[in-house]
């Protein structure tokens, strides 16, 4: 690598779509029984976040809709969506920018608040050297809907992640 790292966000930057909404849509389509469960868990998370003093915006950004999902299922669906839908939603400009950085021998890093299985699938497709997405260190079993202990915490932002990555590369 040339000593330069280029950091990218996913949704709205490289991808002209919401990867996590697309994943949630497929999950609901394939497992419709999850809709009332996901709605209830999201609502409970929203109310709980409001009671803890979070803003309405932050309270609404919870992962209750993914509660009781299996990490392996999310991985499989994410890979399928990247192959069939999301790869077509990456703009030509984004692909050209990534290609330019690759030609310059820059290290490419994806830093996103998207759930980790989707972030990893997109990073693999885009040829990223590293990826930081939302998820616990050990992604096995069933999701609870809580983000406690997850990487790339939404409330603290991506800056600490980028700073830590930059220090680790130096």
Regions found by a protein language model. Give the residues of each.
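Alpha-helix boundary/capping residues
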Residues: 27-30, 81, 169
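Acidic/polar active-site rim loop that often engages polyanionic ligands
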Residues: 20, 56-59, 141-146
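C-terminal cap/substrate-recognition subdomain and adjoining C-terminal extension
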Residues: 1-3, 76, 83-170
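Active-site neighborhood of HAD-like aspartate-dependent phosphohydrolases
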Residues: 1-52
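Metal-dependent phosphoesterase signature
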Residues: 57-93
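Short, compositionally biased "basic patch" segments
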Residues: 45-71, 126, 130-135
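Exposed alpha-helical structural elements
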Residues: 22-23, 35-39, 61, 73, ...
């Amino acid at each position: 690598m040339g000593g330069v790292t280029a950091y990218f966000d996913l949704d709205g930057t490289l991808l002209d779509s919401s990867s996590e909404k697309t994943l949630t849509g497929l999950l609901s389509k394939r497992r419709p029984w999850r809709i009332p469960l996901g709605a209830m868990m999201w609502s409970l998370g929203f109310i709980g976040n409001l009671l803890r003093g979070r803003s309405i915006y932050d309270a609404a950004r919870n992962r209750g809709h993914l509660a009781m999902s299996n990490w392996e299922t999310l991985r499989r669906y994410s890979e399928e969506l990247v192959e069939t839908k999301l790869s077509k939603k990456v703009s030509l400009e984004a692909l050209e920018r990534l290609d330019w950085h690759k030609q310059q021998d820059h290290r490419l890093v994806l830093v996103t608040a998207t759930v980790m299985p989707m972030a990893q699938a997109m990073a693999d497709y885009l040829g990223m050297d590293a990826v930081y997405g939302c998820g616990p260190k050990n992604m096995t079993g069933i999701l609870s809907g809580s983000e406690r202990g997850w990487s790339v915490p939404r409330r603290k932002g991506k800056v600490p992640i980028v700073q830590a990555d930059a220090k680790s590369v130096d």
